[in-house]
Swiss-Prot record:
InterPro entries (alphabetical): aa-tRNA-synth_II (IPR006195), aa-tRNA-synth_II/BPL/LPL (IPR045864), Anticodon-bd (IPR004154), Anticodon-bd_dom_sf (IPR036621), His-tRNA-ligase (IPR015807), HisRS-like_core (IPR041715), HisRS/HisZ (IPR004516)
Major location (coarse): cytoplasm
SUPFAM superfamilies found in the cross-reference section: Class II aaRS ABD-related, Class II aaRS and biotin synthetases
Entry GO terms, CC: cytoplasm
Pfam families: HGTP_anticodon, tRNA-synt_His
Membrane-spanning ranges: none
Compartments in which it is found: Cytoplasm
Protein name (database record): Histidine--tRNA ligase
Family: Belongs to the class-II aminoacyl-tRNA synthetase family.
């Protein structure tokens, strides 16, 4: 029988790799908590109709990339390809009108059938932040600043913020009329994929990565030139407030987001730290999505960060594990029982305590403690068990023992004093 393997585009995250993941997630969640943003959790599996209505039938995500199947009840179900539509559905279903202003975050696996590459898998993990009910430019600026600060806190270098305005629905309709005329005249200059989009989702052509099409688009109408005075004012205010916060940005009038629901502010944060420019974070305003999905008219803005790419870019220092505080070496029936009881007591001090369960010789257990670079060890053998005491030994940064003490199992005061001086105060 052939060995079973994971599916292409999925990855096993092993303990050593997860050290960096957990450190990154810890920093991210601390930043979100400081900004008073609350978590929301939605199902991984949703009705397919949610994404058709929410993301847009003509998008690549819906037409090419979704994992969709019929369940036993003949219902069309889809593994979520992104989080915003699910959050919108959850808010509508659970009564958004009772709490119209919310700042929410989510984190979890998403699924898209794409070509796997570094930092992008078919099952990938995404952090999303959504500000629901907020219409002011200040909310746009705050969410951009939050994304910028999270990436900076993680030590990601060479960050670039690109911004654009997609205007409101009327602006886009006016642009689309002019753009469609241009597309019909210049159809032969476009790649086949873009030609197929002309009657389905013409705005997505602006985001084409095909060099032939990108060259042709240099002479196409620009959406920014069709913005109303009101939309221009909003965009100008956005730039002014980013300048006040000293967040550098580049205007990119060709920047459109890959999903249909965006309006007004669109932004991406990229980094060249991996050698070529890679998008780390993307977001924008989606004032029409919740109404489009059957809810009340509700403005909103959000962003998403792919965690796989974030892990690749985050600082090397986040790969360093926290060393074990105490490694308990034990041998003998009574000693093993005492060691287990002591390990539970020590963990109440918020220490990393590893109890050796191998039953190996003392020398092998000492080697394991040394390999883990444990800050200290406790030794309990037959003699210590008979005397109802244990040896605790502290190591310096070079791994040399520099303090040793014998403590009775019943002397909690002495144990706590030793821990405070040698481990808890570090």
């Amino acid at each position: 029988m052939n060995n079973l393997k994971n599916l292409r585009g999925t990855v096993d995250l092993l303990p050593d790799q997860l050290i960096k993941w957990q450190n990154v997630e810890k920093i991210v969640l601390e930043q979100l908590a400081r900004a008073s943003i609350k978590e929301i959790r939605t199902p991984i599996l949703e009705m397919t109709e949610l994404f058709i209505r929410g993301i847009g039938e003509g998008t690549d995500v819906v037409s090419k990339e979704m994992y969709t199947f019929l369940d036993r009840g003949e219902r069309s179900c889809t593994l979520r390809p992104e989080g915003t539509a699910s959050v919108a559905r959850a808010l509508i279903q659970n009564g958004i009108s009772s709490n119209p202003f919310q700042k929410l975050w989510y984190m979890g696996p998403m699924f898209r059938y794409e070509r796997p590459q570094a930092g992008r898998q078919r099952q990938f993990h995404q952090l999303g932040v959504e500000f629901i009910g907020y219409e002011s430019v200040r909310s746009d600026v705050e969410i951009i600043a939050l994304a910028w600060d999270i990436l900076g806190k993680l030590g990601i270098k060479e960050l670039n913020l690109e911004i654009n305005s997609l205007g409101d629905i009327d602006d886009r309709l006016n642009f689309q009329k002019s753009f469609l005329k241009w597309l019909e005249k210049n159809k032969d200059s476009l790649d086949l994929d873009s030609q197929n989009r002309i009657n389905k989702n013409p705005l997505r052509i602006l985001d084409s990565k095909n060099m032939q099409t990108k060259k042709a688009l240099e002479n196409a109408p620009i959406l920014f030139n069709f913005l109303s005075e009101k939309s221009h004012k909003r965009y100008s205010d956005l730039k002014k407030q980013l300048n006040v916060l000293q967040i550098p940005y580049v205007e990119n009038f060709n920047l459109v987001r890959g999903l249909d629901y965006y309006t007004h502010t669109a932004f991406e944060i990229t980094s060249c730290a991996l050698g070529s420019q890679a998008t780390v974070c993307g977001g924008g305003r989606y004032d029409n999505l919740i109404k489009q999905m059957g809810g009340p008219n509700t403005p909103a803005i959000g962003f998403a960060i792919g965690l796989e790419r974030l892990i690749l870019l985050a600082g090397k220092d986040l790969e360093v594990p926290r060393n074990t505080d105490i490694y308990i070496i034990n041998q003998g029936l009574i000693a093993e029982s005492l060691a287990m009881d002591l390990s539970r007591k020590l963990r109440n001090y918020d220490l990393l305590v590893e109890l050796d369960l191998s039953g190996a010789s003392f020398s092998k257990q000492f080697k394991k403690a040394n390999k883990l670079k444990s800050k200290s060890i406790i030794v309990i053998g037959d003699d210590e068990a008979a005397n109802k005491e244990f040896i605790i030994r502290l190591f310096d940064h070079s791994g040399n023992a520099n303090k040793e003490e014998v403590i009775s199992f019943e002397n909690d005061i002495k144990l706590e004093k030793w821990l405070k001086i040698n481990l808890l105060s570090k």
